[in-house]
């Protein structure tokens, strides 16, 4: 299990860390404008100024996916596995989507299912996996996960109606 905290180093006492954050803000804005190459330039400046702030890599990988540089993006996402449980799950989902784009559907499902077994599981991550499996026509597996979630939450939980609806849809798809 991946129980360590997310690993990012930042201190306001270091001017280079502050400058790195400013460049990252530029990179984020440029990415939002679909200027991925220039965004990557600013991300790389940020990484140079603060190489111990691993979160910069998430935007870099997202930009590379948008530029259809899937293998480079995957390598970055795999490095993010070590940045903490949040990034491990986020990166695993993104790698699964990359595999899907590369017409590796079975490998995608297997990859995300395996990653799920090696993270700190919570309701939302279970819901993510159940949705992913349902979207890939793995209805029985998704029903098990939806049922597991329902057994752990009350009817007034925000996830309850969504889980109930999606489980019902999965049942409909298999004819039950």
Features from the language model and the residues they span:
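TPR-adjacent "capping" and linker segments in tetratricopeptide-repeat scaffold/adaptor proteins
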Residues: 7-22, 154-158
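TPR alpha-solenoid repeat register
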Residues: 56, 90-91, 125, 159, ...
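Short coil turns that delineate tetratricopeptide repeat
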Residues: 51, 85-86, 120, 154, ...
